[in-house]
């Protein structure tokens, strides 16, 4: 069971299956009737919760995918290979193994496009492995799809007693890459070349792609 999330209300755990890992939390301030209703809704829809990567159904490509829309006159980007300390190499390979196991990336022998990974500090002694798409972002036109205005969202909550939020499990990785653009996401490590089959973090327009898909999916309940 994960540590209780940090929120204002005191919390009580709700188990959605026989597994001790399938736990969410509800406010301890709910009445018994409210808690019973909430439990019923959660159990009725427990199939929409993802606890591991294998629980993620992913978006069907015809519904949405991430296109890079590279400027036609652009030449393939190939960054100079970076070298890392052996300790960092182990961290990188561990992350690559996780991505391979999850089906997010695929190994390839040769690709025209290639960038490097970077290892940055995260929460003290931990490290985060990222792909450096800085150069690639220069050859993509900006996607100007409008993001929601925070002030309008706040105004729309007036006089509503209950608010609903969605926390998508590895949300970007649930969106597939447009297949002809997959090789342009390639990155190199000590053990080879890999490319993303799903939308990675770090690209300039991923936020717009994600918001466009959310607007499409929830169109019937927005507004």
Protein language model regions, located:
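Retroelement reverse transcriptase polymerase core
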Residues: 6, 13-223
């Amino acid at each position: 069971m994960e540590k209780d999330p940090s929120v204002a209300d005191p919390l009580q755990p709700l188990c959605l299956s026989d597994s001790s890992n399938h736990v969410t939390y509800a406010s301890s301030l709910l009445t018994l009737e409210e808690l019973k209703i909430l439990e019923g809704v959660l159990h009725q829809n427990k199939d929409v919760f993802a606890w591991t990567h294998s629980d993620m159904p992913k978006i069907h490509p015809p519904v949405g995918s991430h296109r890079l829309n590279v400027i036609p006159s652009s030449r393939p980007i190939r960054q100079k290979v970076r070298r890392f300390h052996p300790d960092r190499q182990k961290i990188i390979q561990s992350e690559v193994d996780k991505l391979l196991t999850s089906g997010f990336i695929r190994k390839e022998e040769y690709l025209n496009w290639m960038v490097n990974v970077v290892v940055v500090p995260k929460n003290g002694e931990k490290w985060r492995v990222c792909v450096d798409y800085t150069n690639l972002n220069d050859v993509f036109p900006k996607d100007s799809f409008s993001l929601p205005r925070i002030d309008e969202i706040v105004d729309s909550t007036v006089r509503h007693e209950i608010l609903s939020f969605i926390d998508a499990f590895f949300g970007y990785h649930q969106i597939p890459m447009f297949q002809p653009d997959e090789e342009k996401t390639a990155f190199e490590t000590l053990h080879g070349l890999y490319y993303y089959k799903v939308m990675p973090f770090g690209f300039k327009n991923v936020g717009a792609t994600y918001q466009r898909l959310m607007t499409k999916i929830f169109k019937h309940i927005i507004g």
